[in-house]
Amino acid sequence: MQNKSWLRHSQRIAVKMLEKMDELSMTQKQLANMMGGSQQYVSKVLKGQENLSLETMSKIEDCLHISILQEEIEMA
């Protein structure tokens, strides 16, 4: 059986992102522009099925002013 623990983390990150985006009334397109990426990629991330790089997680943290990495380390 393949280890998919990253999928569980990715889904938690997606939920946190969606909550913050809702709080900020931020669209996927707006977040993509801030991150320097595409709306399509942000959509994939928000589905919780994207294996995120540290660089991407850092960009998300900076753009949404949330902590992802520290919380995921504490939950591991």
PLM region descriptions:
Residues 25-43:
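Short alpha-helical DNA-recognition segment
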Residues 55-70:
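DNA major-groove recognition helix of helix-turn-helix/homeodomain DNA-binding modules
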Residues 1-19, 24:
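N-terminal flexible/basic segments that precede or flank functional cores
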Residues 25, 70-76:
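Short, charged recognition helix plus adjacent turn
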Residues 27, 53-56:
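Residues that mark the N-terminal boundary/hinge immediately upstream of a DNA-recognition element
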